Amino acid sequence: MKLTRRYRFSAAHRLDSPRLTAEENRTLYGKCNNPYGHGHDYVLDVTVDGSPDESGQIVAREPLDELVRERVLQRFDHRNLNADIAELAGVVPTTENLTVVIGKALADGWTMPARLDRVRVSETERNIFEMEL
């Protein structure tokens, strides 16, 4: 059985690769290459997989929420992904890369009996990135 919890955070970024020319960056990243950056209201879905325990739950909600607060929301909410997130230093902070960083952050802190199954980060209604763990 799987449980998915949904969280929200806002962050800014600029997609710009030092390996590309200014023209190549504009062509590849479009409006996401705005020199002043831009922001998104991200939606994070965290899915766990397991069997209900004697309490009837796959995982207690509060410890899961606390882990996500500590490992993701407090670190990423209202931040500039280019400047404020060490794991994204030196890489283009695409939502693909952001999803990997979030997945690793949650996996590294995971101590619950249920298995951390996947993370899914929605950047927009049309851009949704999912990573199985």
Per-range role (PLM):
Residues 1-133:
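Charge-rich, low-complexity N-terminal segments
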